[in-house]
C-alpha cells in the first residue's frame, strides 16, 4: 500500500510488531509489491523480539512514527521491546477474544491490572493478572486492524511495558535497597 512508503526516508523509524527499526533502504516497484523496505536487525533485537521468527509473507503490525498534528491513541510507546510473551490460551467469544500471555517472571512486576502494555506495538489495557502473566481482552476493532487475531497458542508477541510503571518501580526498588 503506497501510504506506508509515501515520504519514507532513509533513517526513518518504523515499528514492526512494535519494535522500532531504522530504514536503511527503500526499493520502489511497479509489480504487485509497492515497495520493499530494508532494516538492519542486530542479534540483541532478534533475541528480545519475535522478529527472528518472521518468514516471507508473515503478517506484521506496521506503524510509522507519530508526527505533530496527528491523533495519539493509547499510550506512548518507544518501540524498545523488553521481552516476548508466549500465548498460553485463546478464548474466542462472540464479540471479543481473551488471550492469556505467559510472561517471563522478571517482567511480571511491571504489568499491572488495568495498566498499559504494548503487545506487538498495539497499546492495550491489561485485563487480568495471574501467576503466569496476564490476560488481554481484545475487541473486534483491535482484532481487525492488528495481527493479534491471527495468532495461535504458542506464538510469541513482543512486549513493551509501560515506561512510567517501569521507571517508578525501579526507582522505588533502588531507593529501598539504598535505604534499608
For every predicted segment, state its role:
Residues 1-180:
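Conserved loop->alpha-helix
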Amino acid at each position: 500500500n503506497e501510504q506506508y512508503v509515501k515520504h519514507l526516508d532513509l533513517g526513518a523509524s518504523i515499528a514492526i510488531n512494535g519494535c522500532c527499526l531504522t530504514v536503511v533502504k527503500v526499493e520502489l516497484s511497479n509489480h504487485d509489491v509497492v515497495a520493499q523496505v530494508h532494516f538492519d536487525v542486530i542479534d540483541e533485537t532478534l533475541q528480545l523480539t519475535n522478529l527472528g521468527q518472521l518468514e516471507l509473507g508473515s503478517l506484521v503490525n506496521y506503524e510509522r512514527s507519530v508526527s505533530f498534528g496527528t491523533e495519539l491513541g493509547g499510550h506512548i510507546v518507544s518501540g524498545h521491546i523488553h521481552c516476548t510473551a508466549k500465548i498460553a490460551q485463546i478464548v474466542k467469544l462472540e464479540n471479543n477474544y481473551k488471550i492469556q500471555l505467559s510472561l517471563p517472571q522478571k517482567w511480571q512486576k511491571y504489568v499491572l491490572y488495568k495498566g498499559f502494555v504494548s503487545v506487538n506495538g498495539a497499546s492495550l489495557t491489561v485485563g487480568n493478572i495471574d501467576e503466569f502473566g496476564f490476560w488481554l481482552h481484545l475487541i473486534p476493532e483491535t482484532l481487525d486492524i492488528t495481527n493479534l487475531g491471527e495468532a495461535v497458542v504458542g506464538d510469541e508477541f513482543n512486549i513493551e511495558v509501560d515506561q512510567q510503571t517501569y521507571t517508578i518501580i525501579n526507582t522505588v526498588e533502588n531507593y529501598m535497597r539504598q535505604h534499608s
